[in-house]
Amino acid sequence: MSNSNIHTTAVIAEGAKLGKNVKIGPYCIIGPEVVLNDNVELKSHVVIEGITEIGENTVIYPFASIGQPPQILKYANERSSTIIGSNNTIREYVTVQAGSQGGGMMTRVGNNNLFMVGVHIGHDCKIGNNVVFANYVSLAGHIGVGDYAIIGGLSAVHQYARIGEYSMIGGLSPVGADVIPFGLVSSKRAVLEGLNLIGMNRKGFDKVKSLSALKAIEEIFSGEGNFAERIKQVAEKYNNNSIVIQIIDFLNQDSSRAFCRFEK
């Protein structure tokens, strides 16, 4: 690549790999095991360390820190990594930390995501594609976030929680439980408020199926009998609804967290 794309104050360690048309602004620091793929742009004062790869067309804004060691006491300098996909926008003061031995040794971020100012993505998180994290969203370790999920500003997610596809979490929500796909949650303590119907409509989901799925989750979380029985009954009743099937599959998976439920 042309040296004219690298500011004279940037510090790039020997061994770092830069693709075509990479742009590195003033006072950036790039470690020796970092890979920046084609068309990556670092605005200024960006620090990227560790075994870290940034996918093509990703833009990172000032004072972001990517690939630093995880914030856990038992970290023993294991060679864990951070992998970030393509076409991501990573705004000012975002932190994405490397994986750990207890979580597969990797933190992974997909493609086409927007992380607004001050977002923190903890060790061993697995983030999908097309997600939006508003300002100062904080994810603890080992969290999975499905495609198209939206998390409102200043929300915090407890370690090991799962955030389902197409779900939406309102701002200022502490989330200590799994959020089902398409779920809409918010509160001082995150509770299920229904489905993310507006977001589902924008993504082209069938309106009739979406409304039917809303009725289905009300039966699951508020109906008669025990929870497992209700899941089975709803699965049989709505077996032609692909949205309900996706939610049922999520509910039937093993998890170390409870589910966000309707407020009593």
UniProtKB/Swiss-Prot annotation:
Known role: Involved in the biosynthesis of lipid A, a phosphorylated glycolipid that anchors the lipopolysaccharide to the outer membrane of the cell.
Pathway info: Glycolipid biosynthesis; lipid IV(A) biosynthesis; lipid IV(A) from (3R)-3-hydroxytetradecanoyl-[acyl-carrier-protein] and UDP-N-acetyl-alpha-D-glucosamine: step 1/6
Quaternary organization: Homotrimer.
Matching SUPFAM superfamilies: Trimeric LpxA-like enzymes
Major localization listed first in the record, in broad terms: cytoplasm
InterPro entries (UniProt xref): Acetyltransf_C, Acetyltransf_C_sf, Hexapep, Hexapep_transf_CS, Lipid_A_LpxA, Trimer_LpxA-like_sf
Gene that this polypeptide is encoded by: lpxA
Superkingdom of the source species: Bacteria
The protein's Enzyme Commission number: 2.3.1.129
Gene Ontology MF annotations: acyl-[acyl-carrier-protein]-UDP-N-acetylglucosamine O-acyltransferase activity
Organism annotation: Rickettsia rickettsii (strain Sheila Smith)
Swiss-Prot/TrEMBL keywords: Acyltransferase, Cytoplasm, Lipid A biosynthesis, Lipid biosynthesis, Lipid metabolism, Repeat, Transferase
Localization per Swiss-Prot or TrEMBL: Cytoplasm
The family this protein is said to belong to: Belongs to the transferase hexapeptide repeat family. LpxA subfamily.
GO process terms (BP): lipid A biosynthetic process
Protein name, entry field: Acyl-[acyl-carrier-protein]--UDP-N-acetylglucosamine O-acyltransferase
A Pfam family that the UniProt record links to this protein: Acetyltransf_11
